[in-house]
């Protein structure tokens, strides 16, 4: 309510602002918003998205009253007067701008009446003089607020069919305040110049994206940044337009309101993943269809549909493909919204719809068959667990499935029997795990979880005092394919095809985001709205907005029978045994359809494993006889095949399939705000911490000095002493010299070394490797190299007995083990 009033005042102010420009007046304030963050893109679904960061700079500029266009014209008149009447011009020696303009005014009036130029200001003030005297150096600001709001505008057919609600603006608009910044709440004076205020907000990942819903695209979801500034007009507080005396503050102080609205485009992008593989079976026939589709679909693009039909040929009958047609359907469900004044009317309408639905449920359900071009199908229903839009778990049977048709049509009449697939998409929900057919416990647990989620969703929607939904189903794209597939009738037969699904005509209305907005910019009304005809997928139970898409594919197949050219059916000897063997082979080679419904993994689990032929299985034959026999067989087979023809029986079937499509926007870089790499130290110019190189070098140097495991002596001791003396000191238990610095030894637990190998030095001819174990570590003597940065690295200067568990870790260091 508050924002609607602000919008109305903003419109009135805007009209007043345009009128004031005509009168020669200008606003003392200008507002501008600059967005510094990348476009607001929500990566991932509503459940897993981390949101998007919106940050920018809000600037309030107090306009300098002496730098306007009128002052420039005043300066031009001053220059003209100075050239024509140089003797009458007064040269100003003051530094202030006011005195210079007063002097120019006196010079300008001297051109008109030179005799009274000295008394023109005091006796007869002009409008220019009054304007300059009414100048200001600061403005009193009472409040400055910035808000990010979500606006939902409802339009037909998503407005309830009640006349009072269709004319109420509060029922047709829903505004939600997402974030508000109280920049200034107390009265404060702002001087002439620009005053900037930074803002930042993390947009939640569960909010719906900016979109236009419905066939007319008038129902819109949009986001706006609204800046509101209230101030006291300084022009009214100084001088009146017709008098030279200043007004009183109590009578002249009037608050003005200035508002700026900037649209924020919020889009959702689901990253591209692996393609979806779906399997459909069509009992009572032996046809199975496997389809491959991308997991996401973008507007203004095309995507391939790969399909393979198996079980086309069986015995003396086979199916020949005639046509493939496809269409993309968009289903939009919007919850009814009403203001507090009309809530009782919405409840009455909801009760009426409940009564109608209960009466319809008693009657047998009849399927609507679509023929030709149909407009959007609109239905009003009350939300419940049965019709709640939600994503099913894999393996859950569909509730809306009708019983399959039985038997083909008669051979005399050409009938098209509809074949509905038994199972839906197994990967409707991205990231869903596969459930094994025998794992009933896991299946029941997942079903219970989904049931609880639906109950919570229904309770959450019932809290909103409305469960009335308007559903619109419309076709947004369609096409057909009449040729271009490959057919193979060998063995069980198969049909393979690849077709392009055209979505180039779909437009979601996404354009370049607005990065700057100001009150100085006039709103552009000449541009026409783009023809928006699709909306991306939305699942928002809080607002009651659901948008989903389905790819419906229909394949027409005609039945054919095989017979000889003379019209006689194909009959082979031992028909009974042959039928039994054919049935056995069919049961073996055909996939188990029940398991095929669950996963393609079990489709070919009964395929026989052919044993490889060994040399004992091959029997020698005469080459002449074999060639003669094979030639006879080839000739007989060729003759028989040439006499066999296929005759259409007149029966046909329509194989209908539905695949869920996820329509989303392109991801661009595809990097969310929480996955971006932070700036390195060198990018921070002011007060930057030390760079990585210096810190790493210092850390290595300190580590080298701290890990010394032997005493270090000074250079004087190296001159007078030797390594043997130092060894004697340690063996006798005597203390070393006074200049020797003792360093503590850090002993770490070392792992047991692997088996070592060495050559036998005695025999040079036999240089075979022999495995030996490591020697006892108590008697190992280590010779430490010299201290770094002192002479040579490998020059030994001290020896010492070190009791350690292992010596293999020292092989890669600068120590020499003996």
Curated annotation (Swiss-Prot):
One Pfam annotation reads LDB19
Chain positions with Phosphoserine modification: 384, 808
| Organism whose genome encodes this protein | Saccharomyces cerevisiae (strain ATCC 204508 / S288c)
Renumbered to this chain, region (Disordered) spans 1-25, 352-374, 388-436, 568-590, 607-644
Source taxon at top rank:
Eukaryota
Leftover remarks: Present with 295 molecules/cell in log phase SD medium.
Q: Which UniProt keywords apply?
A: Cell cycle, Cytoplasm, Golgi apparatus, Isopeptide bond, Phosphoprotein, Ubl conjugation
Q: Which residues carry this modification: Phosphothreonine?
A: 93, 619
Q: Where in the cell is it found?
A: Cytoplasm; Golgi apparatus
Note the PANTHER family from the entry.
ARRESTIN DOMAIN CONTAINING PROTEIN, PROTEIN LDB19
This protein's record includes keyword Methyltransferase? no
The name this protein carries in UniProt is Protein LDB19
């Amino acid at each position: 309510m508050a924002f609607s009033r602000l919008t109305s005042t903003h419109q009135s102010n805007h009209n007043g602002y345009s009128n004031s420009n005509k009168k020669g007046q200008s606003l003392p304030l200008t507002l501008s918003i600059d967005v510094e963050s990348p476009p607001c893109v929500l990566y991932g679904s509503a459940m897993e998205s981390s949101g998007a960061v919106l940050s920018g700079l809000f600037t309030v500029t107090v306009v300098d009253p002496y730098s306007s266009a009128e002052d420039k014209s005043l300066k031009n008149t001053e220059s003209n007067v100075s050239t024509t009447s140089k003797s009458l011009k007064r040269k100003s020696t003051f530094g202030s701008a006011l005195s210079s303009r007063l002097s120019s005014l006196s010079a300008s009036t001297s051109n008109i009446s030179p005799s009274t130029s000295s008394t023109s200001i005091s006796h007869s003030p002009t409008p220019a003089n009054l304007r300059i005297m009414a100048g200001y150096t600061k403005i009193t600001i009472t409040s400055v607020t910035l808000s990010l709001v979500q606006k939902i505008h409802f339009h037909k057919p998503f407005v309830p069919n009640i006349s009072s609600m269709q004319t109420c603006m509060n029922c047709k608009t829903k505004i939600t305040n997402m974030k508000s910044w109280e920049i200034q709440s107390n009265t404060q004076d702002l001087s002439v110049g620009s005053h900037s205020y930074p803002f930042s907000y993390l947009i939640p990942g569960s909010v719906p994206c900016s979109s236009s819903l419905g066939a007319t695209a008038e129902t819109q979801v949009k986001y706006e940044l609204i800046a509101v500034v209230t101030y006291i007009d300084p022009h009214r507080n100084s001088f009146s337009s017709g008098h030279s005396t200043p007004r009183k503050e109590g009578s002249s102080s009037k608050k003005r309101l200035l508002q700026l609205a900037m649209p924020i485009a919020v889009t959702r992008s689901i990253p591209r993943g692996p393609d979806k593989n779906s399997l459909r079976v069509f009992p009572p026939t032996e046809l199975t269809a496997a389809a491959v589709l991308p997991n996401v679909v973008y507007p203004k693009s095309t995507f391939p549909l790969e399909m393979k039909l198996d079980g086309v040929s069986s015995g003396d009958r086979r199916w020949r493909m005639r046509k493939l047609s496809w269409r993309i359907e968009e289903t939009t469900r919007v919850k009814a919204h009403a203001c507090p004044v009309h809530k009782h009317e919405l409840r009455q309408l909801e009760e009426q719809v409940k009564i109608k639905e209960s009466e319809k449920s008693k009657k047998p359900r009849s399927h609507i068959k679509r023929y030709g071009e149909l407009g959007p199908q609109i239905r009003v229903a009350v939300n419940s667990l049965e019709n709640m839009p939600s994503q099913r778990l894999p393996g859950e049977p569909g509730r809306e499935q009708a019983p399959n048709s039985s038997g083909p049509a008669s051979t005399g009449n050409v009938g098209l029997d509809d074949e509905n697939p038994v199972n839906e998409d197994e990967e409707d929900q991205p990231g869903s795990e596969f459930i094994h057919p025998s794992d009933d416990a896991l299946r029941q647990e997942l079903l219970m979880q989904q049931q609880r989620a639906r109950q919570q969703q229904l309770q959450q929607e019932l809290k909103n005092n409305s469960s009335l939904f308007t559903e619109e189903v419309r076709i947004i794209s369609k096409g057909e394919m009449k040729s271009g597939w490959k057919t193979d009738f060998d063995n069980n037969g198969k049909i393979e095809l690849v077709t392009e699904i055209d979505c180039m005509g779909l437009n979601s209305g996404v354009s370049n985001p607005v990065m700057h907005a100001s009150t100085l910019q006039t709103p552009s009304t000449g541009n026409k709205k783009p023809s928006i005809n699709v909306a991306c997928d939305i699942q928002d139970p809080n607002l009651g907005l659901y948008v989903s898409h389905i790819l419906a594919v229909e394949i027409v197949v005609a039945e054919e029978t095989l017979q000889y050219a003379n019209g006689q059916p194909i009959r082979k000897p031992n028909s009974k045994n042959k039928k039994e063997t054919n049935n056995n082979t069919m049961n073996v080679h055909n996939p188990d359809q029940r398991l095929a419904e669950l996963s393609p993994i079990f489709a070919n689990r009964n395929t026989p494993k052919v044993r490889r032929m060994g040399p004992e299985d091959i029997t020698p034959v005469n080459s002449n006889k074999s060639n003669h026999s094979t030639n006879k067989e080839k000739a007989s087979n060729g003759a028989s095949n040439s006499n066999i023809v296929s005759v259409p029986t007149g029966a046909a079937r329509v194989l209908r399939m539905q695949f869920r499509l996820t329509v989303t926007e392109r991801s661009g870089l595809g990097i969310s705000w929480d996955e971006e790499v932070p700036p390195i130290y060198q990018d921070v110019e002011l007060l930057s911490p030390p760079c990585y190189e210096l810190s790493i070098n210092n850390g290595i140097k300190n580590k080298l000095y701290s890990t010394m495991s032997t005493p270090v002596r000074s250079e004087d001791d190296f001159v007078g002493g030797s390594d043997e003396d130092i060894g004697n000191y340690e063996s006798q238990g005597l203390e070393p010299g006074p200049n020797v610095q003792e360093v503590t030894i850090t002993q770490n637990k070392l792992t047991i070394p692997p088996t070592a190998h060495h050559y036998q030095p005695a025999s040079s001819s036999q240089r075979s490797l022999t495995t030996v174990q490591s020697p006892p570590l108590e008697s190992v003597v280590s010779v430490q190299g010299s201290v770094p940065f002192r002479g040579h690295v490998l020059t030994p200067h001290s020896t010492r007995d070190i009791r350690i568990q292992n010596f293999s870790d020292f092989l890669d260091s600068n120590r020499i083990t003996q």
